[in-house]
Design a protein with these regions (language model features):
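Short, positively charged and aromatic/hydrophobic N-terminal segments
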Residues: 13-15
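Conserved N-proximal alpha/beta basic substrate-recognition cap immediately N-terminal to
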Residues: 17-18, 29-143
Length: 143
C-alpha cells in the first residue's frame, strides 16, 4: 500500500498558510507521471492548497546582486496538476523569480553528475546562503 504524502503548512511552522513550492526538475515533458515521485509530490502539495512551481536546473542563474538583494534566480513555471498521467500538468504562467521567494526549494533533478548538475548544486548552495530554504542539501548531492 502506497504511503500518502502530506504537505502540512504546520510542519513548516507557517500556521496554516499555503506554501509556495519550487521543484527543480528534469524537463517536465520527460517526467513519467505514473511512476515519478516528484509528480506525486506536486499533486499532493497542490491537493493540500499549496502553489506548485517547476524550474529546470539549466534555468538557475546568478545575477550580481545589489547589497542585501538575492542573486540566484530561475525561470519558474506555475503549474496546476491533473490526474491524467499523459497530460498531467498545465502551465499557468512563468516568471523569473529569486529562489528566496519560495517557501521551499526541492532539488528533484536526476543525475547524471555533469557540469549542469554540479552548477545547479553550487547555485542552490548560494541561494541557501541568501536565505532560501533548500531541501536535499546541495553539498550532500554534490559531494
Amino acid at each position: 500500500m502506497a504511503q500518502q504524502l502530506r504537505f502540512s503548512p504546520d510542519a513548516f511552522g507557517l500556521n496554516g498558510r499555503s506554501l509556495k513550492l519550487l521543484f527543480v526538475v528534469d524537463p517536465l515533458d520527460s517526467l513519467k507521471a505514473y511512476k515519478d515521485s516528484t509528480v506525486a509530490m506536486m499533486r499532493a502539495a497542490e491537493k493540500h492548497g499549496h502553489e506548485v512551481y517547476a524550474a529546470e536546473a539549466a534555468s538557475l542563474c546568478w545575477r550580481r546582486p545589489e547589497p542585501g538583494q538575492p542573486g540566484v534566480f530561475c525561470l519558474a513555471y506555475h503549474l496546476h496538476t491533473r490526474p491524467d498521467d499523459h497530460d498531467w500538468y498545465r502551465e499557468t504562467g512563468c516568471e523569473i523569480l529569486p529562489l528566496k521567494a519560495f517557501d521551499a526549494v526541492l532539488m528533484r533533478k536526476d543525475p547524471p553528475f555533469d557540469s549542469e548538475y554540479v552548477t545547479a548544486t553550487w547555485l542552490l548552495e548560494r541561494a541557501e546562503a541568501e536565505g532560501a530554504r533548500v531541501y536535499n542539501k546541495p553539498r550532500a548531492l554534490r559531494d
